Structures are given as C-alpha cells and as structure tokens.
UniProtKB/Swiss-Prot annotation:
It holds the Pfam family Glycos_transf_2. Its EC number is 2.4.1.355. This is Poly(ribitol-phosphate) beta-N-acetylglucosaminyltransferase TarS. Induction: Expression is up-regulated in the presence of beta-lactams. Belongs to the glycosyltransferase 2 family. Attaches beta-O-GlcNAc (beta-O-N-acetyl-D-glucosamine) residues to the C4 position of poly(RboP)-wall teichoic acids (WTAs). Prefers UDP-GlcNAc as a donor substrate and is specific for poly(ribitol phosphate) WTAs. Can also use UDP-Glc and UDP-GalNAc, but not UDP-galactose or UDP-glucuronic acid. Mediates beta-lactam resistance in methicillin resistant Staphylococcus aureus (MRSA) strains. The gene is tarS. The active site is at residue 179. The lineage of its organism: Bacteria, Bacillati, Bacillota, Bacilli, Bacillales. UDP-N-acetyl-alpha-D-glucosamine binds at residues 9, 41, 68, 76, 92-94, 127, 178, 207, 211-213. It comes from Staphylococcus aureus (strain MW2).
Length: 573
C-alpha cells in the first residue's frame, strides 16, 4: 500500500493550482509512495487541462462531478472514497506544501504511530493561520492538554482507516464550516494525535477573489454545524466529565474566535432574532452543567443564548465592551454582575488582564514620554486608577510614575530622568509595567508588545550625567515577549561621543558607538574663561548640532570644559 493520498478539491483554480502541483512534483519522497487525487467541482476554466499536464510527473487520479456541488465537501468525499494511501492529506487547490512535507511526515508517523498528524502551517500574502498549537513538535497531544481544538480545518494528515472505519466524511448538505465537524470527529476517534512543528510544512495562501472554501452561510446552517459538533462530543466514547471539558473548551473557542463573537453589536437589529434563534438551538444542545466549565465571562452569554433572549444577550456584550454594568461589585478579585433590573446576578466572573497598547514612546536625555491605551478591559473608566511601574529585573527595586495626562483613555506618563536617575544605578535592567488598580485589586501588565511603530532604531540611547559619572540609558524590546525595558550602564564619555567644530559657530556632536538623543533647545559650552550660548537641535539619531551665538576659535574649541543642555551638564575635562 502506498503511504499517502493527497486529496485536492478544485473549482476554477487555473490561476494558482500550478503552484500546488509543482510543490507536489518536487517532493523529496518516492513518487510511487503517494498519489494525488483531484476531484473537480465542474470548473468552467482551464483547471483540468492544467492538471492533466502533470500526468508524467505525478501519480494522478482525476475526476469531475456531474453537477456543481457548491462547496468542497462532496469533492473531498469522492476523493476520500477513491484514496488508496495509508494516510490522506487534504490540500486546498490555492495552497501548496513544503518539498519535505511527505518525507518528514512519513518518518514521524512511522516512529510515533499517529492517527492524526497536524503539520505546521504558514500564512502567505497576509493569510492568517493557527499558530498556538505549533510551538513545538509533540508525539502525542489531546484536546485538553494542547491547543489543537483551535484548528479545525481539514488540512491535516489522517490515517485512512480512521476515517473510513468510523464513517467520517464531510456533510455534503452543508456548504461552510462542515470541515470543523469532520475534524472534530477525527480528533474524537483517534487513538493518537501528533503535532509536527519542525518547519513550515503547509503554506496557506491568500489569493485575490473567492477562496473555494469561503461562501456566505446562513446563521441556521452555521449553528447547525456547531450543534452537530456539540452532539458529536457528547456522544463520544469517553467519560462524561472528559466530554464536558472538551465541549467547554470548544465553546471557549467558538465564542472567542467565530462569527458569534460580538455578533449582537455588528449584525443589523432586524437580523438579530434570526441569529439568536439559531444560536439558541445550538446552545440548547449543551447541558447546563457545562456552563460551569467555560470561561466565566461566557456564562451570561450562554444563559441568554439558551433562552433566546436577544435583548439581554446584547446588553451583556455591550456591557463587556463599555465596562459599565447595571450593578456590579468585586469580591476576592472577581466580578459579580447584574446586567439588567430583575435579571440574575452572575457571580465569580474573572477579570481578565487588560491589553495595553503603547501608542507613543519618545525619550531624550531629560525625560521619557510614553502614551498607553487600555483595550478589552472589563472595567470601564472611572472605576480604576493607573500608574506606570519600573521594576528592576532582579525584583529588588521598584519606581512608580504617576499619570500625567488622561486624554480620552489615552494615558500619558512623563518619566523625568532627573527624578529617577539616583535610583537607576541600583540595577542595569528595568522592566516597564502598567498597573491598574480597582479598589484593593491590582492588575499588572507588561508594556510594549502591542505598539505603534517605534520611532528609533535599535540601540538608540540617551546620555545621563550622575554625580561625576556618565551612564547610557537604552530602551529595548525583550527577546522572548517583545516588551519594552530600559538598560542602564556606566560608560566613558569620550568613548561614546565626539565633538567637532564645523565652520566657526557650529559644534557637531556624534555618537561613536550608537545614536544618542538629546533634548532640543537652549545649550551652552563652557570654556576656560568664557561661556557661549547656543541652540541644540537633533539632526539625526546619530548627530546633534549646536549653533553657537558667536564664533569660536579652534584653539578655544579644544579647551571646552562643559557642555550644558537644558537639563543636563556634561563635564568634558
């Protein structure tokens, strides 16, 4: 028996199927060990003619449906029934695979006896693909100890007997989301699920026009698939507690990432009864005992969806978005909420950490100015206080910076280096946090991972004069989590900057090892017997120009004792 059947449904794919076929023809795997099963859904272009050109390059099976089915489900089923490989790999006609995909997958499957193998995906041309489940290769994962429930597309490798023996096919009457039901059935029936993440094996490509798998689907059809998935989980040959946990995780995924997320705030009011009725049919298939296992913020939504109460459902989503509630209190760090008069209290709702976006970050040798916004926070403005926290990497020292400006939820903090420079030498690395306080509860969030474009090149720094020593302050982004931190270290001034006289009244300050930024404005140079005023301007990250108020002779330039900026003095002798 050959190792793989690569299943490709096609429909008007002439513009891009060549890339897929080339990737299959270039596989570092014996051509006798895999077949390519193409089932066409009545294309009206040159798709099949292009496929036929690969007869001598690939072990091809090509067929065409008699009538257009309107979706990839039926072509995949026809191909699956024709498949002779030990394993099947579903590939969309507008995607392609790594030349080592089949070779590496075969070796991995033989070693670990996988029934389902997830291969690492990579998006091309801005196509979004699941990533969280591909952080590492894993010979065996489950629906609960991994993130595989967050990828329910069929573009995986399946043991053929797993599918055929358990009658796992795509529901042909459904034209969208049918792949989620297919994949969930495979997960539930597999003895071993594995993840191969050594490299990008599957390239999902964003193309112009309509993807074969994408088409409008009504709320009734969409939520019917979700209901069928819930039923499939509940009917699985597993312990009830285990099934309930899987269903809860599926609901977490569904309400966080599907069209259900925020639908009452997006869909036209006149269409919302249709949506809530269909959603309600889905949720009514979920036993109420499962509600206790989902993310706590979803419990009110499940309650009102099950009751098909669109008004209160909308109130919940709007309340979460605004962070404003009819009644609420915080007990032991959790929210108790009543969304409307006469409605039940929902207790023990976790307050998720807010997401912080750094919208601005500017610094010089005088101050650091950063602007932050809070996003997706369950508590509205007016119920919390914010402050910036600088925490030393060794956790021994902490500095707090109060809020300077609150402009329409844009929080600005001014870190005056003069105020903190005495504390900075205590530690080389200072991490930046935003603290959000609600009563006695404090939420701490690292800053910088989400940000607007950073205004400086890497290693751009500021010079600080403290007592008789000079220091370099360098903001940087951490390697692992891409958050902003401050690096503070002693330097030798003459190794870091140089001064040159340009003409008779300009001094050029240049960074020798990196760019240095200075506060623009009034400056002065102090000579042995004189002081000359000037105006400092930053001409580039690596260069500063000081335009003097009068000419200076070269012999006097060599005797400059000090350089004064608006808030710093640099002793040069």
């Amino acid at each position: 028996m050959m190792k793989f059947s690569v299943i490709v449904p096609t429909y008007n794919s002439e513009k891009y199927i060549t890339e897929l076929l080339n990737s299959l023809a270039k596989q570092d795997f014996p051509k006798t060990e895999f077949e390519v099963v193409v089932v066409d859904d009545c294309s009206t272009d040159q798709t099949l003619q292009i496929v036929e050109k690969y007869r001598n390059k690939l072990n091809l099976k090509v067929s065409q449906l008699e009538t257009n089915s309107g979706g990839p489900g039926k072509p995949r089923n026809v191909a699956l029934k024709q498949a002779e490989g030990e394993f099947v790999l579903f590939v969309d006609s507008d995607d392609y695979i790594n030349k080592e995909t089949l070779k590496d997958a075969a070796a991995f499957i033989d070693e670990h006896h996988s029934d389902v193998l997830l291969i690492k995906m990579k998006g091309v041309n801005g196509r979004g693909v699941p990533q969280s489940m591909f952080k590492e290769t894993a010979p065996e994962v489950t629906l609960l100890n991994s993130r595989i429930i967050y990828t329910l597309s069929p573009t995986k490798i399946y043991r053929t007997t797993l599918l055929k023996d358990n009658d796992i096919y795509f529901p042909e009457e459904l034209k969208s989301a049918e792949d989620q039901l297919f994949t969930m059935k495979a997960y539930l029936n597999a003895n071993r699920i594995s993840v191969l993440s050594d490299k990008a094996y599957y390239y999902a490509t964003k193309r112009e026009g309509e993807h074969m798998s994408s088409a409008y689907v009504s709320p009734e059809d969409f939520y019917e698939v979700m209901r069928l998935i819930a039923v499939e989980i509940l009917n699985a040959d597993l312990e009830e507690a285990h099934k309930d946990q899987i269903l809860a995780e599926f609901l977490n995924r569904h309400f966080s990432f599907s069209r259900t997320n925020g639908f009452s705030l997006k869909v036209k009011l006149e269409d919302q009864p249709q949506w809530i009725n269909a959603l309600g049919d889905f949720i009514q298939a979920v036993p109420e005992r499962v509600d206790a296992l989902v993310m706590s913020k979803l419990r009110p939504l499940l309650h009102y969806a099950r009751a098909k109460d669109i008004d209160n459902y909308r109130t919940v989503e709007e309340s979460y978005r605004q962070g404003q509630y009819y009644r609420f209190d915080i007990v032991d760090g959790k929210l108790n909420i009543q969304f409307n008069e006469g409605e039940p209290y929902f207790e023990g709702i976790d307050i998720a950490k807010p997401k912080v976006k750094m919208t601005a970050f500017k610094f010089d040798n005088h101050k650091i100015v950063t602007e932050l916004t809070l996003n997706e926070f369950m508590i509205g403005e007016g119920h919390y206080d914010v402050r910036l926290k600088l925490h030393s990497r060794n956790k021994k020292h902490t500095m707090y910076v109060p809020l300077s400006v609150n402009a329409n939820k844009q929080y600005r903090f001014n870190i005056m280096l003069e105020d903190i420079k005495a504390y900075l030498p205590k530690e080389k690395i200072w991490d930046v946090f935003l603290e959000v306080q609600i009563g006695t509860e404090v939420f701490e969030v690292r800053v910088g991972n989400q940000r607007n474009k950073y205004a400086y090149t890497a290693e751009t720094s500021a010079l600080i004069h403290l007592n008789n020593d000079f220091y370099r302050l360098t903001p940087y982004f951490t390697k692992d989590f891409n958050n902003i931190s401050l690096y503070f270290t002693a330097i030798t001034l003459t190794d870091s900057i140089s001064l040159k006289l340009k003409g008779k009244n300009k001094i050029i300050l240049t960074g020798l090892d990196r760019g240095y930024v200075f506060e623009e404005g009034m400056a002065s140079v102090v000579l042995k017997d004189d002081m000359i005023m000037g105006m400092l301007s930053q001409t580039s990250e690596n260069e500063v120009e000081i335009l003097l108020s009068k000419d200076i002779k070269k012999r006097d330039f060599k005797n400059i004792v000090k350089l004064n900026t608006a808030h710093m003095t640099y002793s040069l002798k």
